[in-house]
From Swiss-Prot:
InterPro entries: UPF0060. The chain crosses the membrane at residues 6-26, 29-49, 61-81, 90-110. This is UPF0060 membrane protein Swit_0423. Disulfide bonds: none annotated. It is found in: Cell inner membrane. The lineage of its organism: Bacteria, Pseudomonadati, Pseudomonadota, Alphaproteobacteria, Sphingomonadales. One of its GO terms (cellular component) is plasma membrane. It comes from the Bacteria.
Amino acid sequence: MPGAGLFIFVAAALCEIGGCFAFWAWLRLGKSPLWAVGGVGLLILFAWLLTRVDSAAAGRAFAAYGGIYICASLGWMWAVEGGRPDRWDLIGVLLCAVGSAVILLGPRTA
């Protein structure tokens, strides 16, 4: 799962974050309600992408994805919103990335 799975997780994270941000922009930043239409589309794509990950259990896929989502969220904050992560953000991201790696790469019995 590492190569393609990681790509799918990152794509899913960008879709989820973009979809949620579309609602944030509409409801918190005063953007047009049309932002919500795009947001819904991205959230549907996000959900579909998670079903493409090679995992026997949805819960394991979702748990591993959670760490990727947290990393991507702070990247979004920095790249899109201009907010720079502080040291506590970075420590938290590191812990989440390690947790996701353990879930993704840990040996499994057949």
